[in-house]
Amino acid sequence: MAEQRQHNDCVQGDNLMRLGVQFSGSVPANSSRRWFTHSWPQEWRVVWIVVPTSPVQNQSAQIEWKVQVERQTSTLLKYYLEIKNLSNRTVTIEARYAVLD
C-alpha cells in the first residue's frame, strides 16, 4: 500500500496540473512488485510515470510498469502499479503522478 501523496501545482496558461511523487520503493533484480494507492477522486485524470532512481546506468531500460484501476466507491478510484525490474540488480524507483485538469 502506498500513502505518501505530495504534490506541486504547475500552471501553464489557463491549465493547472498537479505533479507529485506518490511513493518510492525498490524492486529486486529480475522480479516484479505491485503497489496500490487508493481514494483518488474519480473526476481527476491521473497519469502515472515510474522512474528508476538508482543505480545509475547508461545501457538499457531498467524497468517497465503497468497501471490497473478499480472503482473503489461511486466517487473514488484505486490504482494498482506493477513494476518489473528488467535488470540483474535491485532498482529503486519513484512512482510519480500528474493530475491533468
Regions found by a protein language model. Give the residues of each.
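Extracellular attachment/recognition segments
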Residues: 2-94, 98-101
